[in-house]
Amino acid sequence: MKISVRNLEPTKVKLTVTVEPEELNPYLDAARKEIAKQVNVPGFRKGHVPGKIIDQRIGFAAVAGEAVNDAVPELYSKALDEKKIRPMAQPEFDVQDVPQSANDETKLKFTATVERRPDIELPEIDGLEIAISKPEVKDEDVDKRLETLRQRFGTLVGVDRPAAKGDFANIDLTAEIDGETVDSQEGVSYELGSNTMLDGLDEALDGLSAGEETTFEGTLEAGEHEGQKATVKVKVNSVKAEELPELDDEFASEASEFDTLDELKADIRKAAAQDAEGRQATEARDAFIAKLQEGLEIPVPKGVKANMVEEQLKGLTPDPEKATKEQKAQAEETVEKDLRDQMVLDALAEKLDVQVSQSDVFNFLASIAQQYGMDPNNFIQAIIKNGQLGSAVQEVARSKGLLAGMRAVKFTADGEVVDLSGFLGEAAEDEESESVEAASAAAAVADELSAKDDAKDAE
């Protein structure tokens, strides 16, 4: 097999693959056997028709067509491995030459155009030192958490005064367009100042007492008249204020397992410190990835970027074409960063020769299944069916590479070494020997088990 590579862009290549007849022959033989299982030829048992008869009765073109369909993807994968090209999207195939008969010496020739990961030269990480901030827990952090807990035990009491920010008003709403009522709601509980309903509602309610009403102009944010201006009439039925408990030992015993307020505060401070350490670990991760990219110009694949931007915009608006310039700019910025981070972590995993084991993949998929309340076997079956197993393996490799890389780096805060072992874990002394292929095989077993379970249920 002869392979030539033409770089179309820094992240896009065109492979031209020429296949020798002896390399294509096994695929032709397999195609003949497969066709023999599907046709009836007088004088021969089904599945036992000689290849020459298949060529004569069915036609060599049909044989070659099936052989090429099987051969091209496999030979393409081999070409990628041989040329060390890491694809980031599906290829575009163009079959140019195909033998026309069993005796035709024409070589199979096809091209594959695909977006690829660019070559990335990472710095040496052994001995690398990265400065990060020191986690701090201030008194106001503790007070803020304590106030949040206090609000959970607050009660609403009716007040005989005009509504103000922070109060809860029970209201009736009626929206009209050109004098016609298009929407109405009764008995809605609304917190003044929350700005969670119509624009202008907070201003309209401010200063109103129970029994009073007013009108204002607002833009409807839901329903068939979404986006249209309407005249909104709002009536206040009642006004309630939040009454919070006193911060004392009685509150501490009611709101927690502690008997005194001092004990509760100490526990809150401890939790705040743990959260601060978690934020420090996140900062360390981000700083490490940024350090790997320092001074590097990493291009991103245009097609992959465009698809990811479109998917992100779909989460913001039903029609991505109607997204605002700000939304598009933000989506592009986010996607570019995510792509560069992913490509750098992929390169790091290769540099560190990260091995992805069967248990790594199963644990990863099982944890996701648990998050969604799904059976692990059924979840793995869905992953395989959707062709996402490779992506799962890639995610595991990135994660393992990131942890291994961060363990090799010294992180400091105010000149002192930071111990992140609680987040990074310890490097395994004995890595399991299972390969990525073993993970695929294991997932296939899970797929088979799940299929058997479905068959039993159907009986």
Swiss-Prot record:
Keyword tRNA processing recorded: no
PPIase FKBP-type domain: residues covered: 166-245
Domain of life: Bacteria
Pfam families found in the cross-reference section: FKBP_C (PF00254), Trigger_C (PF05698), Trigger_N (PF05697)
One of the GO biological process terms: protein transport
Reaction it catalyzes: [protein]-peptidylproline (omega=180) = [protein]-peptidylproline (omega=0)
Intracellular or extracellular location(s): Cytoplasm
Class in the EC hierarchy, top level: isomerase
Gene3D superfamilies (alphabetical): 3.10.50.40, Trigger factor ribosome-binding domain (3.30.70.1050), Trigger factor, C-terminal domain (1.10.3120.10)
One Gene Ontology molecular-function label: protein folding chaperone
Keywords: Cell cycle, Cell division, Chaperone, Cytoplasm, Isomerase, Rotamase
UniProt EC number: 5.2.1.8
Primary location recorded for the protein, binned into one broad class: cytoplasm
A GO cellular component annotation in the UniProt record: cytoplasm
UniProt KW Cell cycle keyword: yes
SUPFAM superfamilies the UniProt entry points to: FKBP-like, Triger factor/SurA peptide-binding domain-like, Trigger factor ribosome-binding domain
Function: Involved in protein export. Acts as a chaperone by maintaining the newly synthesized protein in an open conformation. Functions as a peptidyl-prolyl cis-trans isomerase.
Comment field on protein domains: Consists of 3 domains; the N-terminus binds the ribosome, the middle domain has PPIase activity, while the C-terminus has intrinsic chaperone activity on its own.
Family in the record: Belongs to the FKBP-type PPIase family. Tig subfamily.
Name by which UniProt lists this protein: Trigger factor
Annotated source species: Bifidobacterium longum subsp. infantis (strain ATCC 15697 / DSM 20088 / JCM 1222 / NCTC 11817 / S12)
This protein's encoding gene: tig
